[in-house]
Amino acid sequence: MAQSTQHNDDALRVSVLSEALPYIQSFAGRRIVIKYGGAAMAHAELRSAVFRDLALLACVGVRPVVVHGGGPEINQWLQRLEIPAEFRDGLRVTDADTMDVVEMVLVGRVNKQIVNGLNQLGTRAVGLSGSDGSLVEARPWGNGSHGLVGDVARVNPDVLEPLLEKGYVPVISSVAATPDDGRAHNINADTVAGELAAALEAEKLILLTDTPGILEDRDDPDSLIRKLRLSEARQLIEDGVVAGGMTPKTECCIRALAQGVSAAHIIDGRVPHALLLEVFTDAGIGTMVVGRS
């Protein structure tokens, strides 16, 4: 019985590799921008699975670019330093003291943890913030009522080109400065990932989230919509099917597709090896939004 089980396991592995082959061939040399955050960042086993997925993508010739958040660790440090955390309209209100913590955590801690984790697997990862080389230029979000919360004013992809050409994996924190006064701003990592994907003419934008994807019924995890056209995604927002925290993620995908990204994916980062399951299998595991059929 044990030998039979082993043969079945071996056959499954071979089948998975066989299914992945055409995708590996198709995406070799292509750029995929991945927003990494949520549960996949908070839990050690999921974190390890993401690092292995990224290492494998790089190993087979895909050019991954990682953009990360770090909300839970920011909250922990704010609490430790007795700085109150405030959220408004789903965004962190960021005064000067909070921004110091955000920059310390995202640039100095989380970014280096990801870089070190990837490098341990033989991946050549390089840590950057949006401020480095003016990779991302920020502008104040809205009317400035949220303090040092920013939006993307401009992306300079030339900073990343030599790294990608030489096989490095850029790991980017979503902190960037305004060009007029050089003040650091906290930008939503989904937004940074989407704008980078467009500027890099990426094949895919992938958002790791804490939900299965876009749901037809937000209270039913089995109502996953596996594929949408750009026009259908817009309609779901208008109809209120996409609401709450899924709205900015879907809008991020829409903007990226409108600027030339081939496909955008919203996937469940709580599933081990979600990246490989989405990129290298026929069924995928999340929602894929495409510009056309």
UniProtKB/Swiss-Prot annotation:
* Main subcellular location: cytoplasm
Q: Which Gene3D superfamilies match?
A: Acetylglutamate kinase-like
Q: Which residues bind substrate?
A: G70, G71, R92, N186
List the signal peptide residues: none
Q: Which Pfam families match?
A: AA_kinase (PF00696)
Q: What is its EC number?
A: 2.7.2.8
Pathway given for this chain reads:
Amino-acid biosynthesis; L-arginine biosynthesis; N(2)-acetyl-L-ornithine from L-glutamate: step 2/4
Q: Which InterPro entries match?
A: AceGlu_kinase-like_sf, AcgluKinase_fam, ArgB, Asp/Glu/Uridylate_kinase, Glu/AcGlu_kinase, NAGK-C
What catalytic reaction does the record list? N-acetyl-L-glutamate + ATP = N-acetyl-L-glutamyl 5-phosphate + ADP
What are its GO biological-process terms?
Answer: arginine biosynthetic process via ornithine; L-arginine biosynthetic process
Query: According to its UniProt record, which protein family does this protein belong to?
Result: Belongs to the acetylglutamate kinase family. ArgB subfamily.
Alphabetized PANTHER family for the sequence: N-ACETYLGLUTAMATE SYNTHASE, N-ACETYLGLUTAMATE SYNTHASE, MITOCHONDRIAL
Name of protein:
Acetylglutamate kinase
- Whose protein is this, by species? Synechococcus sp. (strain CC9605)
UniProt gene name: argB
